[in-house]
Amino acid sequence: MENKAMYLHTVSDCDTSSICEDSFDGRSLSKLNLCEDGPCHKRRASICCTQLGSLSALKHAVLGLYLLVFLILVGIFILAVSRPRSSPDDLKALTRNVNRLNESFRDLQLRLLQAPLQADLTEQVWKVQDALQNQSDSLLALAGAVQRLEGALWGLQAQAVQTEQAVALLRDRTGQQSDTAQLELYQLQVESNSSQLLLRRHAGLLDGLARRVGILGEELADVGGVLRGLNHSLSYDVALHRTRLQDLRVLVSNASEDTRRLRLAHVGMELQLKQELAMLNAVTEDLRLKDWEHSIALRNISLAKGPPGPKGDQGDEGKEGRPGIPGLPGLRGLPGERGTPGLPGPKGDDGKLGATGPMGMRGFKGDRGPKGEKGEKGDRAGDASGVEAPMMIRLVNGSGPHEGRVEVYHDRRWGTVCDDGWDKKDGDVVCRMLGFRGVEEVYRTARFGQGTGRIWMDDVACKGTEETIFRCSFSKWGVTNCGHAEDASVTCNRH
């Protein structure tokens, strides 16, 4: 190292701009060249500061510098930990600079501690100055790295804020889309259930219409047979009447011709009768005169009966009369009554139950319905064998106790029965529970009105031999995919 003349100043000789009062930073490290550039050099160039160059003061200055750098590093680490993670390259560069700075301070401390008390102070000061100059460069590089790291941290923080905002916006949009999708799914489920109900109702109506059309077809076939018979008989009667009318027309024409001839004969006979009457009148007058004369002559003559005269000759045979008019044929008799229908054939075997369809998606929980009216007071408890059926099942909204909507009692509440798989076997069990002989008809689709409250039973499948409907096969209590538009009903046989 180049030897330089070094003049030390005393503490009292230094003014306000000396190293004694200036703040210590990386740019003022050159002030350790104490007697070279200071203002005391102008005043007293030949006097040195013997007290400032002491080794203890130098150690205290180095320790203060070390403590200051340590505090700066602690603040940098706290800032780095409290902010988002920076890039790996910047962190590696910062770590290398900190390690190098620590090693430099450690070497400096070891040198100061191991330096002899009587060594060349000037040589040691120059070494310390070079070390501090190197540390100043390292601190400047470290400050630049820290500034770059701080800029990167601020950029990362801004990006993190933007990312959080984008994530929050995406979360809100996702939540809105999820709510919208759930609402649309619920609406689709409601529409699907309504469509299924309508399809079942229309299927029932179509079945009834098909049965009515079949009955109407049979009635039309019967009417067609009757009409064909009437048409045949009427055609025969019309032909017969046409023939009779033709005969009557011929007879009328013949009768009119005979009438004309009779009229002519009558006119001639009338003239002849007039002439004969005139002649008869004249003869009668002559006979009257002669009779008067004879009567006078015969008064004096006694009358005596003479012998019979001879038999006269046989008269001529009269002309043969005309044949009479043929009589009209009698009317055709009415067709006989329709025969009685034959005995009905034996009832066919019931078909096999179809396979159970897949269970649909469970719908959303509906709103709680209004509180129902207070039910009627039940009968007093008694023998279980005689009270179980009336207390556990009833028929509602019918014209009498023999018909209505089927309701069962469970969990201290009345509920309805779904009509899925509802048939006469199930109705027989219900009617026997109520004391009737059997079922007359079973109904679906809420024939006697829709119920309220829970639907306790669904997919009921009785064999027809059970004592109660609760021994039949059905889904669990309250487990159903039906609505009250599918409540089951029965009409029991009262006879």
From Swiss-Prot:
Name all Collagen-like domain ranges: 305-357
A GO BP entry is: intracellular iron ion homeostasis
Keywords on record: Cell membrane, Coiled coil, Disulfide bond, Glycoprotein, Ion transport, Iron, Iron transport, Membrane, Receptor, Signal-anchor, Transmembrane, Transmembrane helix, Transport
Q: Which residues form a coiled coil?
A: 91-111
Q: Which residues lie on this side of the membrane: Extracellular?
A: 82-495
- Listed transmembrane segments: 61-81
Where composition is biased (Low complexity), the residues are 323-341
Disulfide bonds, paired cysteine numbers: C418-C482, C431-C492, C462-C472
Q: Does the keyword Cell membrane apply?
A: yes
Q: Does the keyword GTP-binding apply?
A: no
Q: Which SUPFAM superfamilies match?
A: SRCR-like (SSF56487)
Basic and acidic residues: compositionally biased ranges:
313-322, 364-382
The glycosylation sites annotated in the UniProt record are N102, N134, N193, N231, N254, N397
**InterPro entries per the record?**
Collagen, SCARA5, SRCR, SRCR-like_dom_sf
Q: Where in the cell is it found?
A: Cell membrane
Gene Ontology MF terms in the entry: ferritin receptor activity
Instruction: Indicate how the chain sits in the lipid bilayer.
Output: Single-pass type II membrane protein
Domain (SRCR): give its ranges.
393-493
* Protein origin, superkingdom: Eukaryota
Q: Which PANTHER family does the entry link to?
A: DELETED IN MALIGNANT BRAIN TUMORS 1 PROTEIN-LIKE, SRCR DOMAIN-CONTAINING PROTEIN
Q: Which family does it belong to?
A: Belongs to the SCARA5 family.
Function text: Ferritin receptor that mediates non-transferrin-dependent delivery of iron. Mediates cellular uptake of ferritin-bound iron by stimulating ferritin endocytosis from the cell surface with consequent iron delivery within the cell. Delivery of iron to cells by ferritin is required for the development of specific cell types, suggesting the existence of cell type-specific mechanisms of iron traffic in organogenesis, which alternatively utilize transferrin or non-transferrin iron delivery pathways. Ferritin mediates iron uptake in capsule cells of the developing kidney.
HAMAP family on file: SCARA5
Quote the protein name from its UniProt record. Scavenger receptor class A member 5
